[in-house]
């Protein structure tokens, strides 16, 4: 599936370059109209990232909850600074389909295991955002990508598999918002290492051929943000490519 992605700060659509808050593009696009556009072209699932929530969960935007109440005919997957039971229950109560957890899962794995058990593993997506170091090791970044840990990608994922986790969103930070193409070899590696996961790719999409290559390498879902906002191709074009055998 092609999943359109919208990141926002203060209710405005933005894109960060490699996760850098000081290097962001702001778009003069109304978030409600942009969602309507994607739905009109056939989108049934949308990925939202609350960048204010990443910095401070207390700043989780009311506009996000307005989106959920305005669009009942589409499913939402939401990430950004989700750290507590209250955050999770508020989002599920608002009608969110899946909640994306990154930093909280890495820093507090036992808490995330409990959430998987209590709320159902199918309702969560583990977000593993990686920096590839000079030794070609995939190290997990946290806290809005501001800090890179010594935790390896494999270790981050495998600890949650016994708790039913299947949905994995993996971003190569060096590709995010760059139009440099997705890291196909990374996703091939993940699908070989963890054949039963449902993998979402994110970062670097520049063309329809990127979509084709990801599908060819058994990626289940492709998150596309900047390429759609800047009209590299339309959601409809991407979806048609995805549905081709």
From Swiss-Prot:
<dbReference type="InterPro" id="IPR023016">
    <property type="entry name" value="Isoase_HisA-like_bact"/>
</dbReference>
<comment type="similarity">
    <text>Belongs to the HisA/HisF family.</text>
</comment>
<dbReference type="GO" id="GO:0003949">
    <property type="term" value="F:1-(5-phosphoribosyl)-5-[(5-phosphoribosylamino)methylideneamino]imidazole-4-carboxamide isomerase activity"/>
</dbReference>
<dbReference type="Pfam" id="PF00977">
    <property type="entry name" value="His_biosynth"/>
</dbReference>
<protein>
    <recommendedName>
        <fullName>1-(5-phosphoribosyl)-5-[(5-phosphoribosylamino)methylideneamino] imidazole-4-carboxamide isomerase</fullName>
        <ecNumber>5.3.1.16</ecNumber>
    </recommendedName>
</protein>
<dbReference type="GO" id="GO:0000105">
    <property type="term" value="P:L-histidine biosynthetic process"/>
</dbReference>
<dbReference type="InterPro" id="IPR006063">
    <property type="entry name" value="HisA_bact_arch"/>
</dbReference>
<keyword id="KW-0368">Histidine biosynthesis</keyword>
<feature type="active site" description="Proton acceptor">
    <location>
        <position position="7"/>
    </location>
</feature>
<dbReference type="InterPro" id="IPR013785">
    <property type="entry name" value="Aldolase_TIM"/>
</dbReference>
<comment type="pathway">
    <text>Amino-acid biosynthesis; L-histidine biosynthesis; L-histidine from 5-phospho-alpha-D-ribose 1-diphosphate: step 4/9.</text>
</comment>
<keyword id="KW-0413">Isomerase</keyword>
<dbReference type="GO" id="GO:0000162">
    <property type="term" value="P:L-tryptophan biosynthetic process"/>
</dbReference>
<dbReference type="InterPro" id="IPR006062">
    <property type="entry name" value="His_biosynth"/>
</dbReference>
<keyword id="KW-0963">Cytoplasm</keyword>
<dbReference type="GO" id="GO:0005737">
    <property type="term" value="C:cytoplasm"/>
</dbReference>
<dbReference type="InterPro" id="IPR044524">
    <property type="entry name" value="Isoase_HisA-like"/>
</dbReference>
<keyword id="KW-0028">Amino-acid biosynthesis</keyword>
<feature type="active site" description="Proton donor">
    <location>
        <position position="129"/>
    </location>
</feature>
<dbReference type="InterPro" id="IPR011060">
    <property type="entry name" value="RibuloseP-bd_barrel"/>
</dbReference>
